[in-house]
Amino acid sequence: MKIAHIHWSLGTGGIETMLPDIVSEQAKTNEVALIIVNDWVEKSILAKVDKRVKVVLLNRHAGSKNPWPIIKLNLFLMRFRPDIVHAHAYDEIKLVVYPFGKRVRTIHNTNNLVSPKEFPKFDKLISISKAVQDETMGQGFRNIKIDNGIPVARILYSKNIPFSDGKLHFIQVSRLDVEQKGQDILIKALDLVKHKFGFDNFVMHFVGRGNDEAMLKQMVHELNLDQEIVFEGLKDQTWVYENLCNFDLFIQPSRYEGFGLTVAEAIAAKVPVLVSNIEGPLEIIDGGRLGLSFENKDATDCANKIVDFIKQGRKEAQVEEAYQYVCDHYDVSVTARKYLEVYQSILK
């Protein structure tokens, strides 16, 4: 089977970090191409792609009207002649003139207001979580659920460089984008933890970059949390997979989230997690059985749950059960295999 995956960029977001793992798994038994349209390509992510995958970098400038990258895309497709063209974001399929093969779209997030306009163009729609599936069904489009996957075996789970300052170290790994990722909620919660509840024996590490970085840093300064909150900047996936295990608590305060790859990664590193009680992350912790959750957008409830963790510490049995749950349900090999089964079903 010949499979062509198309995506706008190869940065450090959840889709981009997962795609190399998916195509590399599929390339073990199939001919696979990965086509990146725009010129935003993170070299450390690209380096993860298996050598058997045909990588096509079109190097289009975002928003460019130059037709040449689109012509190159379709010339490649005509030569490669894929059985499956698999798109991962809105408007990608509009670039494809190639008339053959079946078209598949993975829906990677909730709050999809524009994407449904193009859903009828696909032979199969795939949602990454029950939350995304339910939303898409509610919009009138049949779809199946295939959970996102992570390379569990590559994630270390034994502390290798533990912190030696006697403090609890919390972490969030994501784009600095308060509208979706909710870092402002977490900062307000940590303000309460320190100034209302009187706990200051912690350090919060934000890993990532984004448009809201300056605003968040100003917020931290105004709340007198400069000693408790550190902005680590962008770290590559290797750093994340090797260092997550050294932290005491992973916190994901997203306002909305289709899935939450970094939540699964933290669990694979055997780190306790605290997430907002939205459906994507909540699904990963089995409705709250395998981790902590707080009321979405509620900084006070988030603070209360952090204080509970500070007082009670990690629950080893829960951490181990969560780890096994992620191994069984969210390993990337399972995701890649299920995609192949879908391709085969629509090619019959």
Predicted regions and their residues:
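N-terminal strand-loop element at the rim of the active site
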Residues: 5-68, 76, 210-212
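Carbohydrate-associated surface elements
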Residues: 131, 149
